[in-house]
Amino acid sequence: MTVLQLPKWSLSIGDGQPLFCIAGLNVLEDIDLTMQTATHLKDVLTRLELPFVFKASFDKANRSSIKSYRGPGIEKGLAMLAEVKQRLNVPICTDLHEAQQAEAVAAVADLVQIPAFLVRQTDLVVATARATHKACGLLHVKKAQFLAPWDCRNILSKIKEAADADFTILCERGSSFGYNNLVVDMLSIDEMKMLGAPVTIDATHAVQLPGADGVFLEFHPDPDKALCDGPSCLPLSGAEDLFRSLKAIRAAVA
């Protein structure tokens, strides 16, 4: 399986590498809360000697209600993420929703995420692949809930043809099981790894960690007051204990 690197940050993900931790907020709220969360997670993961990429979305474009909080938007959101990156010296992960956002997002984010619902959108995939490769970043592609793990081969092929390079991390986040329900088929992780890409698992939605190369986790200092997906967020105060356990599990199964 391919081991991918972010040379600027001396980070690697793949077989034999430390547990790769993409962690942060579901959505950006304000700069103070963002800095509080990023600082705490950096301190925890530095102590545990685990690679850390700070994640936060600038726009939650698929909220169920038009009245729901979506985020600060691309211009203000990317400025906030750039400030976190500069002040804390940490790599950034964020997602995008439209092809025309690719260049701007790739200029700030080291790990550019394509949301699960959008992975079949060829124009978005191609534009994101080209912009991210040009910026020397990595792609983080969430497997759609309606896709079989082996169908990710087609997504990887599009990216390869668009950018002529292998720089994609796949993410397992569950599969549709009837209406309004998700299940996690643990075989999916190995199935996707057999496609040649490292695999993370969105553990705050899937709540499992069997053999993945990394984790994608969303935290909040006070989940009950989070402006988006509070019930799916983990309390920031528990981050160190959780990552310490995950590090031990990774060491035991490696």
Region spans (language model):
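Glycine-rich, proline-tolerant flexible connector loops at the mouths of alpha/beta enzymes
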Residues: 21, 25-34, 52-74, 220-231
